[in-house]
Amino acid sequence: MAQRERNREDRGREERDSEFVDKLVHINRVAKVVKGGRRFGFAALVVVGDQKGRVGFGHGKAREVPEAIRKATEAAKRDMIFVPLRSGRTLHHDVEGRHGAGKVLLRAAPAGKGIIAGGPMRAVFETLGVQDVVAKSLGSSNPYNMVRATFDALKHQMHPKDIAAQRGIKYSTLQARRHDVVGSEE
C-alpha cells in the first residue's frame, strides 16, 4: 500500500515538473585532496522556469554529473521568483544588476528583436519566457556571478501599476508619459 502511495506521489511530481523548462548553464569538475590522492566530484548550475514569468536557479554538487544536475534542478525549483513581463514577451523597463564582480545591464526590446544576450543570461531569459531583450554583461564572466547578477536585476523589475502606486499617481498618467506606448498595451 505504501508503494502505491509513493507511485501516486511520483506521478503527481512528474506532472508538476512537466510545466518547467530547465537549462544546464555550467558543469565544473572539482577535486578534494585527501590522504590517498584526489577525489573528483562535479558541481552543476541549472536554471529552471515556466516560460510565463517564473524562474529560479540552483547549484548542486555530487560525485556523478546526473546527480549534481538533479540536485541543482531541485534547488532551482525551491527558490523561484516571479518577474512581471510586458506583453508576455519583454521587460517593462531597463534595469541593472550586480553580484560580486559581475554586473549586467538588461534593456527592454521591441517585438521581433529576439534574445540578444550571452551564455548564462540567455539561459535565464529562455526559461523565464522573455522573447525580446538586449542584455550586456559588464565585469566578471564567471557563470555563477552572471546568473546571480541577472537575478538581482530581475528582482528589481516592477510592473508599471506598482510604480504608479509607489509614486502616488494614476496608472494612466504613468502610461501617458511613456514614449513607446500607444494606447493601453501591457
From Swiss-Prot:
<dbReference type="InterPro" id="IPR018192">
    <property type="entry name" value="Ribosomal_uS5_N_CS"/>
</dbReference>
<comment type="subunit">
    <text>Part of the 30S ribosomal subunit. Contacts proteins S4 and S8.</text>
</comment>
<dbReference type="InterPro" id="IPR000851">
    <property type="entry name" value="Ribosomal_uS5"/>
</dbReference>
<comment type="function">
    <text>With S4 and S12 plays an important role in translational accuracy.</text>
</comment>
<dbReference type="Pfam" id="PF03719">
    <property type="entry name" value="Ribosomal_S5_C"/>
</dbReference>
<dbReference type="GO" id="GO:0003735">
    <property type="term" value="F:structural constituent of ribosome"/>
</dbReference>
<dbReference type="InterPro" id="IPR014721">
    <property type="entry name" value="Ribsml_uS5_D2-typ_fold_subgr"/>
</dbReference>
<keyword id="KW-0689">Ribosomal protein</keyword>
<dbReference type="InterPro" id="IPR013810">
    <property type="entry name" value="Ribosomal_uS5_N"/>
</dbReference>
<comment type="function">
    <text>Located at the back of the 30S subunit body where it stabilizes the conformation of the head with respect to the body.</text>
</comment>
<dbReference type="InterPro" id="IPR005712">
    <property type="entry name" value="Ribosomal_uS5_bac-type"/>
</dbReference>
<protein>
    <recommendedName>
        <fullName>Small ribosomal subunit protein uS5</fullName>
    </recommendedName>
</protein>
<feature type="domain" description="S5 DRBM">
    <location>
        <begin position="20"/>
        <end position="83"/>
    </location>
</feature>
<keyword id="KW-0699">rRNA-binding</keyword>
<dbReference type="InterPro" id="IPR020568">
    <property type="entry name" value="Ribosomal_Su5_D2-typ_SF"/>
</dbReference>
<comment type="similarity">
    <text>Belongs to the universal ribosomal protein uS5 family.</text>
</comment>
<dbReference type="GO" id="GO:0019843">
    <property type="term" value="F:rRNA binding"/>
</dbReference>
<dbReference type="GO" id="GO:0015935">
    <property type="term" value="C:small ribosomal subunit"/>
</dbReference>
<keyword id="KW-0694">RNA-binding</keyword>
<dbReference type="Pfam" id="PF00333">
    <property type="entry name" value="Ribosomal_S5"/>
</dbReference>
<dbReference type="GO" id="GO:0006412">
    <property type="term" value="P:translation"/>
</dbReference>
<dbReference type="InterPro" id="IPR005324">
    <property type="entry name" value="Ribosomal_uS5_C"/>
</dbReference>
<keyword id="KW-0687">Ribonucleoprotein</keyword>
